UniProtKB/Swiss-Prot annotation:
Positions of [4Fe-4S] cluster binding: 53, 57, 60
Name listed for the protein in its UniProt record: Biotin synthase
One MF term in the entry's GO annotations: iron ion binding
UniProt lineage: Bacteria, Pseudomonadati, Pseudomonadota, Gammaproteobacteria, Enterobacterales
Keyword Cytoplasm among record annotations: no
Gene expressing this chain: bioB
Organism: Pseudescherichia vulneris (Escherichia vulneris)
Amino acid sequence: MAHHARWTLSQVTELFDKPLLDLLFEAQTIHRQHFDPRQVQVSTLLSIKTGACPEDCKYCPQSSRYKTGLETERLMEVEQVLDSARKAKNAGSTRFCMGAAWKNPHERDMPYLEQMVQGVKAMGLEACMTLGTLDETQAQRLASAGLDYYNHNLDTSPEFYGNIITTRTYQERLDTLDKVRDAGIKVCSGGIVGLGETVKDRAGLLLQLANLPTPPESVPINMLVKVKGTPLADNDDVDAFDFIRTIAVARIMMPTSFVRLSAGREQMNEQTQAMCFMAGANSIFYGCKLLTTPNPEEDKDVQLFRKLGLNPQQTDVMTGDNEQQQKLEEQIFNADTDQFYNAAAL
């Protein structure tokens, strides 16, 4: 379905109800119409300001409301961030994402954030940030600095959202996505599976994303990472097939978006990850940690790519000499290197 045709909840729930193999076949068919099925986009995520967040997101160890043992850190120095970006590039990432545990960035932080974006872009990497809600001026300033992507997840359906977060409204999240889009920055927005939501809620989340005026260019689908001290620490595990279904439905509904395996990949075995790629996932976060949760060791990713015959995707902002593509391909096929352990200095 073209993205200008609005989906209905009944259409989405019908997709979730399909026999799994039929759903995977449909998703993979659509995926191949828009993407090279062997290409996977590789991103690295760095927490540039950790913990002490005033929000009450029940899944998040960075909230100041929960005792999770997380060490809080102030905003990193610009050069520290750029050093991590260099390591990520050397390890083969094509996009560098910077995350700060804020409700929203303060004016005093904006010059440093702009310098980070400019420095990352100067390396030939795509730059992405996730900083909480933005106003129009902040979005414009980040766009002027060269920011490619802004991440702001919807997390779940509007109906279930109030069970998870009370300090920021669903509409505030949608408003931030509008401001980012209006500033000319690409949108990265997805959600989390395993919050205690129903299949109808998963359908509702994807409905919101797919029915945006322009669907997000990047859609991260996270599996809840249960962190001791957070209210969701004792939630039931997510069934792997339910997660794979969510990936497949996202691919069908948003055929031209990158669908990213994000948090929770540490909990997935190789077979589950392979089925996610079959379902249409074509982007991963690659590095030691995803903000404050574990990510599979990088050499395991290298080995999995090699087993599945997958290749890292070249970034759009490269200068033309293919140096970065060659670096990652060399390491994919010579996986005895330890450079990947330095992909994200968190």
